[in-house]
Amino acid sequence: MLSSKKIIIAAGGTKSGKTTFLNAILAEISKLKDRVILIEDTPELQCSAEDCVQMRATTSFSMDDCLKQVLRMTPDRIVVGEVRSGEALALLDAWSTGHGGGCSTVHSNNARDTLTRLENMTARVSRNPQQATIAQAVNIIVYLKYAGNTRKVQEIVELEEWDPAAMKYRFHSLN
């Protein structure tokens, strides 16, 4: 999955293991010799790739600003620690311009809800619905859950397309 440069979203609630999962993905990506651009506002991710550029979003240089700069840095993979707001649209656009293999985290209640959360985040900066953009950019959603002091992968889905006639996403389970 990583060598085929699928875009992966690690989704789940607080303490579900999203960041730990992303760090495991980064450990594997680091073996591939790709240029990784890592963007975070809170430093939590570790990337041992030989060619890793880390960017920090701040109050004066936003996540959106970082994403606008990243395309000039010839990234092989764009990784964002956590998507929370309107920067989701800039990230989806970056992933949709030939920069596959990226990953990020999103807080959500299940894999399908992750898509709704992305729609809501992009709606903060665009009046146009972004379902087709989401379906073009995102390939895999890994939903993690924390229950009873354990963290586990509860669901893995592959997003196939946005069907405008049916007004729904088409995806299948990889569990």
Where are these regions (language model features)?
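Switch/coupling sub-region of P-loop NTPases
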Residues: 2-15, 20, 24-137, 143-147
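Conserved P-loop NTPase
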Residues: 135-175
